[in-house]
Amino acid sequence: MIHELFKEFSQLEQVEAIALGGSRAGQAYDQNSDYDVYVYLNSPIDEANRLKILSKYCSYMEIGNQFWELEDDCVLNNGIEIELIYRSLESFEQELNSTVFQHQAQNSYTTCMWHNLLHSKILYDPNGHYASLQRTYQIPYPQELKKHIIERQLLLLDQAMPAFSHQIEKAIKRQDLLSMNHRTSEFFASYFDLLFALNEQTHPGEKRMLEYAKTNCTLLPKQFEETIRKYFQLLYQPQQGEQAVVTLQTILKELKAILP
C-alpha cells in the first residue's frame, strides 16, 4: 500500500525526489513505526491533488499543516501514522550550503538538515539530484562550522547576559514553573548542539538526544547522563531549587572541561 502511495506522488511533475527519514530509513524500527516522508518539489502541489492521492490510502488526514514546514499529517488505512513534508529542493540546497559551506551556526539544531540529508533513504530520484546532494555533503565536519557552533552556544549557555543558565536561575528563584521549563528546554537544545559539534556529529533532531550522544560521541562530560537526570529530578521540587542551580553549574563546568 505505502509503495503505491509513493508511486502516485512520483508521477507528479512537481516532484523531483522523495526520501524516507526517521527510524524507517534505518534499521531501528518496528511494524508500528511512523513514516517520515520528504517530498522535494520544483513547484507547489495544490492541496486538492494531494488530498485526492492521500484519500485512497489514509483513514484520517490533516492537509496543509504549516506549524513548522508545510506538511500533510495522516493515518494510513493500516493505522500507522505518516507525515509528508514538502520542501523546495532549491531552498533545501541553499540552507545546506549556508550551514555546511558558509559555516553559519544557529541557536540550536544547527546541522539537523545536514543529518536529515545524509541519513534519508531515497525512494524516488529520477535525475539523481538528491543522490548528488548526498555525495556533495558526505564530507568531513568543517572545522570552521564546529568553531562557530561552539562559540555561539557558549554565549547562549552562560557567557552572554541573557544566557539560558542565568534565566533558569532567575526562574527557579521566582519558582516560575513555566519559565523554568521553557528555559531548560532551550538550555539543553543549545547544550546538545555544542556537544554534537564538538564530536563532529551531525545533529539527529530533538528525539533521543541523550541516547544518541552516548552511542555516537566519544567526548562526553563526566557523569554525563547522571548529572542531567539529577538536574531534572531536582528542578521541580521547590525546596531543592538551590541544588538544581548547583547541578546546572556542574553540567556547564563538566561540558567546558572537555572543550579544546
Where are these regions (language model features)?
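Conserved NTP/Mg2+-binding pocket subregion across the NTase superfamily
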Residues: 58-172
